[in-house]
Regions:
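Terminal low-complexity/charged segments
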Residues: 1-190
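Active-site- and interface-proximal helix/loop "cap" or "latch" segments in soluble metabolic
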Residues: 169-256
Length: 256
């Protein structure tokens, strides 16, 4: 499937994304990919799908530099799934999404220094010492916006009300089938909100791959998910083969 590739500027990004959702019925946000585009700056690629006809498009936008930070308007108001996807981009690339209600890290510790998927990230062991203390806890998050003068404003927001009862499910719990922590906010027996903490077994595979040859990366795809190791390996190999223009024999197709 070939994607229609769209490039949007910072100024028309919010309005054009709204048109794609509401007028062209791209109702499914498949993913958001944060990228370090070198001299272009930091930006995102959004993969959208129209679930009526299965048409897909990709949207690229470059973040605007404001007061030393890279910012892009949030699309949480259009696609609710963007809430976690934008937090992941912020966590690894450092882009702040204007209007996002909960701009915290998602995978890495709150006291982690830097954004590891930036090309200039310092990979030295001295700069990435394993912390010996517990992760700092906070009942607050932050929302970013631009004021009338175009400056970046950080607004502190509470995560919990005074009467909220918070239960931690995980990091290790038999019902989660994996290592994650769910801060579950209860009102009596009703679940009001869940704040996920997802980075307990995150190993930085994306960053490790940057210094490897293609064959060396194959063992790491198998470790992404023990239920679908072969599927991940086929996905990576397929992209490499297509990019190199390799024609596969019938034997390979049959084996796969």
């Amino acid at each position: 499937m070939k994607l229609e590739n769209i490039e949007l500027s910072f100024d028309n990004f919010a309005s054009e994304m709204s048109k794609l959702k509401n007028q062209k019925h791209f109702d499914y946000l498949v993913t958001i990919i944060g990228e370090d585009f070198g001299e272009e700056g930091y930006g995102c690629i959004y993969i959208l799908e129209n679930t009526d006809n299965n048409e897909r498009c990709s949207v690229k936008t470059i973040a605007k530099k404001v007061d030393g930070s890279d910012v892009i308007p949030t699309v949480v108001n259009l696609w609710k799934s963007a809430e976690l996807l934008e937090r992941e981009v912020f966590d690894f690339v450092g882009i702040k999404f204007l209007g996002h209600p909960d701009m915290r890290r998602l995978f890495l510790r709150t006291d982690f220094n830097g954004y590891p998927l930036r090309k200039d990230f310092d990979m030295s062991p001295e700069a990435n010492q394993f912390p010996l203390t517990d992760e700092p806890e906070s009942d607050f998050t932050v929302e970013y916006s631009l004021n009338a003068d175009g400056h970046l404003v950080a607004t502190k927001k509470r995560l919990f009300d005074d009467e909220d009862f918070v239960v931690n499910i995980g990091p290790n719990h038999p019902s989660t089938h994996g290592v994650l922590r769910l801060q579950t906010v209860l009102d009596g027996e009703k679940v009001k909100r869940i704040y996920p903490h997802l980075g307990y077994i995150h190993r930085g595979i994306e960053k490790m791959w940057e210094g490897m040859t293609y064959p060396q990366t194959l063992a790491l795809t198998d470790r992404l998910n023990y239920l679908s190791a072969m599927m991940h390996r086929h996905a990576l190999v397929g992209v490499i083969e297509e990019g190199m223009g390799i024609e596969l024999s019938d034997r390979i197709h049959y084996i796969r």
